[in-house]
């Protein structure tokens, strides 16, 4: 490519200031546009442009209806390497040397061994017991039991591995946010180079639409750009950039031209450091896995206690080692539910498939359980609560000026080029449909001169010719600067001046961005016309969804990069509360200046925070979690990734970046919060199914541990090992269909309440064991007791155990009495099939060496129904007990003084650490 001289004139922008409403956010080209009498061929047809914008708006709405501190320290680049001549760039040899030293411009990939990942699913308390049982079965040459146990192990690992494999790699997705190619100055010429080959010190050319591939700073004097970095900082509109300002990788140039020097690449960029924050976030096992492992440990302890009792009795009777090992195998199989991980994982996988139909993609199965218990929802504003597009509100006009007149003047002071339109211009042109007079008159005016936004005067100026041939100067811009333009021409009446300033102040306090509009006709005086407020509006369904979230026991907190005023106004419209604070009060590292306990109270009671950076979001989630809350975080940008990963449930909303999607636990393809609330209800249904199954399965384990332990210890006899294995298989096969059961959802967040769970499970297990013990012991009465004319003891006990255990699921699945909720046909059918098979086992003596007559089988059914009624009554009484209800739904205990002291100490340490880092 031939050499290209590098000259740059300062482009202009529309204004943004902190002391007043900020109108224009996207970059105009700095070069003044001189429009001759004959319209430029480059200008787009205004009617076609308006129609296209309005058509796009309608299409977007139709689709909706359907539907910088970092964890890791950046590698510093020596300043002498950042003195590249912008007109020449780096030499090819220097590029090669720097690439060798600093590497490619891409995220470092953590290699993942899929085999190791698969083998990790064989680690855990329950898995260890299952593996020990398999080894014991192999030692006894009991290959049937060995095969069944191994099959269950691999089933559990397979389901979990497949689900986790689909989640993908967070670093890989963050890498995808980088641009693909870049325009670079090397060897004195302009070249196209792959983005991953950019090195520190490279000179890059930026223009409209450029996706910036690396961090850097602008080196073109008097340049002005507007850069969309909403996916990084959360700011809803483009940000002004001047000479010497920093720009970040993965952000987009909306308007303007200039050159930048690369100061950081790959992992050292803002996005790269965000990746390190994500990787530093809690990525452990998850709350559900912790609960499951805790249950497994307790069951394992109970198994050991039972085995000690049995071994003591056997040694006292001098029982031979082989029977002792068989007893050990039997207790091991029944004591720890071999199918618990598989059934629960399958239940959640079925729920994930159901959520997928609702356009919610579950990337981690444990997220379903976490979402069901979420108490606080931290939501990003832009694109989540709002539409992420500007809309105009009711204009303020001075006396004697019509709204159409103000609208016409504002639209005349706008670019006629499609590529030159910024968010403000688009909002005005799309809103012309509401001002038919202004729309009809717009095409009759001829543009003579157009001056894009001037960052000094903070306004856009256009000189037009009316249909009558009158020369008119139209301006729009920062309200007070427009007012100053008029005042410099002639005095403004005091009442007009006062009303105008009051309106501007009111709009600023309500969080609106505002544009002042004025004009000058011919040789006359300047006229102030009024103010047009604009805002990124809330989604149509957000307010109703927020109210529904509150009814479901959720506290919603908004975290946004926008100003406090904008955040408060958005919250006011949505009913979120107005306790919105500047994130600076949290401190750079989340510590702030308040004592730790006060900071925790401050975060807990706030309705949201504005002007936040990634570390602020991360800190808010962390503080709430330390207070004992389960926290969900919604987001759509790179800046949300760390807190999405940190949260108990990370939610990537519709339109989220790849980085946010990969960091999230659940990805939504449908827009708005309504889809999240639907998923919340579904997750609570799934949680209820899991909770019912766990209570059921623990009760079954305790049932057989108690019964078999007593039988072996007292009578020196046990059920046939093969029948024990079939009981375990039948119990889990029958309940695999619970994933498709009809289940209610709780009106409040649900959690694993282990005291309540264990209390109910123990009572169910004792009643089951008592029923089976009575069945066994009354057989030896003169007339056979409950079971008369019995054939095989093993066969009868096998049937009684199978029936009562299988029917227990109908009790635990219900919220009230077992008859208050009809089970799904899948669950009822599965239990029926298992009951039929168990009956066939008993009738024909399979594995029990003797058949049983039909009369005895009927008596077993009648006796089992009686036990079932006792179980149902006891479960209902416990579920209606105030004590159990308080344990299940009670709020977390208030922190005590020692907890608050720990919070104060941790906050102090964070402040010391932050000051030390800043000092270095």
From Swiss-Prot:
Q: Which residues cross the membrane?
A: 118-138, 143-162, 294-315, 327-349, 722-740, 757-776, 827-847, 860-876
What Pfam families does the database record attribute to this sequence? Cation_ATPase_N, E1-E2_ATPase, Hydrolase
Q: Which GO terms describe its biological process?
A: proton export across plasma membrane
Gene3D superfamilies referenced in this protein's UniProt entry, alphabetically: Calcium-transporting ATPase, cytoplasmic domain N, Calcium-transporting ATPase, cytoplasmic transduction domain A, Calcium-transporting ATPase, transmembrane domain, HAD superfamily/HAD-like
Residues reported in the UniProt entry to bind Mg(2+)? 636, 640
Q: Where is the composition biased (Acidic residues)?
A: 17-50
Q: Name one GO molecular function term.
A: metal ion binding
Task: Give the span(s) annotated as Disordered.
Answer: 1-71
Q: Quickly give the catalysed reaction.
A: ATP + H2O + H(+)(in) = ADP + phosphate + 2 H(+)(out)
Cellular component GO terms, alphabetical: plasma membrane
Please list the residue ranges that the record marks as compositionally biased, kind Basic and acidic residues: 1-11
> According to its UniProt entry, what is the function of this protein?
The plasma membrane ATPase of plants and fungi is a hydrogen ion pump. The proton gradient it generates drives the active transport of nutrients by H(+)-symport. The resulting external acidification and/or internal alkinization may mediate growth responses.
Descriptive protein name: Plasma membrane ATPase
Q: Which organism is it from?
A: Zygosaccharomyces rouxii
